[in-house]
A protein has these predicted regions:
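Perimembrane helix-loop-helix junctions
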Residues: 2-4, 168, 197-227, 234, ...
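Signature aromatic-anchored transmembrane alpha helix within multi-pass, membrane-resident enzymes
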Residues: 18, 223-227, 351-356, 411-458
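Aromatic- and kink-enriched transmembrane "portal" helix at the membrane-lumen/periplasm boundary
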Residues: 29-33, 74, 88-92, 99-102, ...
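Membrane-proximal lumenal/periplasmic loop motifs of glycosylation machinery
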Residues: 31-41, 54-75, 81-89
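Transmembrane-helix motifs of polytopic, lipid-linked glycan transferases
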Residues: 93-114, 153-156, 331-334
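Membrane-interface alpha helices of multi-pass inner-membrane proteins
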Residues: 172-193, 203-204, 225-230
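Hydrophobic, aromatic-rich transmembrane alpha-helices
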Residues: 206-207, 289-358
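Hydrophobic/aromatic-rich transmembrane helices and adjacent perimembrane loops
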Residues: 316-327, 354-427, 435-438
Length: 580
């Protein structure tokens, strides 16, 4: 009994972390088993890719319709399909598997930059989530979970390489770590360019701190493995275009990038809108603020919708939340920059083993803050932050790495616990900066844990509403299949989930808002639609297509033979050409 207790005590942090990861998995499995979140066309497209991989032996290199976003999520889902069959639940279980991998890798990074207790706190933050955060984790957009996985892997490997740079007994392992770094960088860039800040900054850190290892063969090894990770992209570029226009398979989905009409805003107005969209909408959404003061997307943006006292109060709260996080992030970067510069001088002058270990910790924390900070800056400069900051908040998913790192950084700079517990530092008094860091770490961790816990509970409370919407979609698919409407036209956000949920018995063509035809993300669907006469149209009930359908029917000389309303949500039109 004593031996068992000793074994448990010696591994208590690892056991607790495993329990936290298991709870994170269970919480997410519970959500997806209950049907939350429901599918959309991006999510369903990934499911179709996974089905084609598992059932047809296809090997897509990129997400259908996106020639810059890898297909790793589809392969993960195909693996789950092999055991559970093709379904929305199985698709999202593949995402949960990827997120669990991220949590494991992130723990490997956190224990290198802080204590195991604070690493556990960081894992607890990752286990929880507000509705928007969980939505981004459980929707198969492609590339976002991979950004977390490979970003955390790059940080963990770089931190270990810096820490072991002076240990001659680990030379072979360092070369293996460099190979792993190159492979993670290549696979990450293939999956999504959002990982680029992690690649660039960790590469710079390796060149700065690990030059004896990376020079010559180390660089060759890392670059070779990077190219290996990028090989799917290289193969795609080297492969001749298929007989059908490549655009049918890999062309980007047409999405608006700015207001359709109106006067052109000035440079100052544009910059202000970009910053406000990032600081008031995107950043709070990806850090849990939606729990404490919920808004709908239409209430949150644009600014014209800030008309009621409740909305104005929530926007004010979001301003405080976003501003506080930006200030704390800046504080963490300043503290770590100072720590890295000071400790590097000591290390170059023959510093102690402890100072070298402290250098690796501080460098790791700096990288874990700097890469998401670069992402925030680039996002703020993009049109997405001003035009649709709620939708594109997913671009800031690397904040899931920044938050635990920020807590570790603030806690590390508490007087005698500042980065580098040298004898000289242990005699320092707590300065104002250190007290600020201590208060920030404790208060921020408590607020975030409470907000994210409430967010997880609140997401479970939203299940009933989502299940009602899922039933409407099931009724629509059942109606189409039972009445033989297997070739239909619809709009983008309906098309692909209809195909997926009908097990490809219903194939659809996509119409733009001006009724022009949009090439499918998968060329075979265009061929199937072309073989059938256009007779069935399916649209959301209150949409531009439904509202203008009768006028379009007159213009195109159609006779509306049947109009069916499904659950007061969708309209199904069956038409025939008018007789000459």
């Amino acid at each position: 009994m004593t031996g068992s207790r000793r074994w448990i005590a010696s591994r208590r942090w690892g056991i607790l972390t495993a329990a936290v990861i298991a709870l994170a998995v269970v919480a997410r499995v519970g959500l997806v088993a209950a049907g939350w979140p429901g599918p959309d066309s991006d999510d369903a497209t990934m499911g179709l890719m996974a089905k084609h991989i598992a059932a047809l032996g296809e090997r897509p290199i990129f997400f259908y319709g996106q020639s810059y976003m890898g297909s790793l999520e589809a392969y993960a889902a195909a693996l789950v399909f092999a055991f559970l069959g093709a379904s929305e639940f199985a698709l999202k279980c593949g995402l949960i598997l990827l997120y669990a991998c991220f949590m494991v890798i992130m723990y490997g990074f956190l224990i290198q930059i802080t204590s195991r207790a604070w690493a556990l706190v960081g894992e607890a933050l990752l286990a929880l989530g507000a509705d928007e955060m969980l939505y981004h984790q459980l929707e198969a957009y492609g590339g976002y979970l991979e950004t977390l996985i490979f970003g955390a892997a790059l940080l963990a490997l770089t931190c270990w390489l810096v820490r072991t740079q002076w240990d001659a007994t680990l030379t072979r392992r360092r070369y293996l770590a460099l190979a792993g770094w190159g492979l993670a960088a290549g696979l990450g860039l293939w999956s999504d360019v959002l990982v680029a800040p992690f690649v660039v900054l960790t590469a710079g850190a390796l060149a700065l701190f690990c030059w004896p290892t990376v020079r010559r063969w180390g660089t060759v090894l890392a670059l070779s493995c990077l190219l290996l990770g990028l090989s799917p992209w290289i193969i795609y570029l080297a492969t001749p275009a298929p007989p059908a226009p490549r655009g049918l398979i890999q062309s980007g989905t047409v999405l608006p990038t700015g207001p359709a009409a109106g006067p052109e805003p000035s440079v100052i107005e544009t910059a202000a809108n970009q910053f406000l969209g990032m600081a008031l909408i995107s950043l709070p959404n990806d850090t849990g603020a939606t729990t404490l003061c919920p808004l709908t997307p239409s209430e949150a943006w644009p600014q014209d919708s800030w008309t009621t006292p409740r909305i104005q109060e929530c926007i004010g709260f979001r301003a405080v939340w976003g501003g506080a996080l930006l200030c704390l992030l800046a504080l963490g970067l300043i503290l770590e920059t100072r720590g890295v510069l000071r400790l590097r001088r000591h290390a170059r002058a023959g510093g102690s083993t402890q100072e070298r270990a402290d250098l690796a910790q501080s460098a790791g924390r700096f990288l874990g803050l700097a890469a998401p900070a670069v992402t925030i800056a680039l996002y703020t400069l993009s049109s997405a932050s001003a035009f649709a900051p709620w939708i594109y908040a997913r671009y800031l998913i690397s904040l899931s790495i920044a938050l635990p790192t920020l807590l570790a950084s603030l806690w590390a700079h508490m007087g005698s616990s500042a980065a580098g517990n040298t004898a000289q530092q242990s005699r320092w008094r707590l300065t104002g900066t250190h007290w600020l860091a201590r208060a920030g770490a404790l208060s921020l961790s408590a607020i975030l844990l409470v907000a994210l816990a409430l967010g997880t509970v609140g997401t479970y409370r939203a299940i009933d509403e989502q299940q009602a919407q899922n039933q409407v979609r099931a009724d629509l698919v059942a109606y189409l299949t039972q009445h033989g409407h297997t070739r239909v036209y619809t709009e983008f956000w309906t098309c692909y989930w209809v195909i997926f949920q009908s097990d490809e018995r219903v194939i659809c063509g996509v119409l733009n808002a001006d009724w022009s035809y949009r090439p499918s993300r998968y060329a075979a669907y265009d061929e199937a639609i072309a073989e059938a006469a256009p007779s069935t149209y399916v649209f959301p009930l209150h949409s531009i297509w439904t509202d203008t359908f009768e006028d379009v029917a007159v213009q195109r000389r159609w006779r509306i033979e049947q109009k069916t309303i499904i659950d007061q949500q969708y309209a199904v039109f069956v038409v025939a050409p008018l007789s000459p």
